[in-house]
């Protein structure tokens, strides 16, 4: 965001040409960030879709280091799982290096919501079913390794 807009209040900012270049959904995320007094300059960029903006905004709201995932190379689904992992203080480095499918990400996210991080025992070559089986083993208190499922 250009410095010229720094001293404008929200009502005046949304009347600028700068704000008009965003879609309505993107504008909503920017407005929500401004209303929460967040640094929207991190995500108020046209290259982010609204869902990516939302994940960055939620991370800022929860005091997460969003610069880890505020990159257009990550889909909004990847950003969501990375954010949730960071919120739990899990090691999410594999998520930054490997590209998991949407279905795989849903299982990883399910584990995060149950305070279980299986990232150290999976990779993106495993099927959805294999990753789900590993998560289920962890839920039962069983420790497993990838070799147990290949």
Predicted features by range, described:
Residues 1-150:
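General marker for long, soluble alpha-helical cores
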């Amino acid at each position: 965001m250009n410095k010229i807009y720094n001293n404008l209040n929200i009502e005046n900012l949304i009347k600028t040409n700068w704000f008009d270049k965003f879609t309505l959904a993107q504008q909503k995320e920017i407005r929500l960030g401004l209303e929460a007094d967040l640094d929207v300059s991190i995500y108020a960029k046209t290259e982010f879709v609204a869902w990516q903006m939302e994940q960055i905004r939620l991370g800022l709201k929860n005091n997460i280091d969003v610069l880890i995932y505020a990159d257009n190379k990550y889909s909004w689904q990847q950003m969501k799982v990375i954010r949730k992992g960071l919120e739990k203080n899990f090691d999410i480095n594999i998520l930054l290096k490997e590209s998991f499918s949407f279905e795989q990400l849903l299982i990883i996210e399910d584990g995060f919501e149950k305070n279980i991080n299986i990232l150290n025992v999976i990779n993106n070559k495993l099927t959805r079913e294999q990753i789900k089986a590993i998560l289920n083993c962890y839920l039962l208190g069983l420790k497993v390794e990838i070799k147990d499922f290949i």
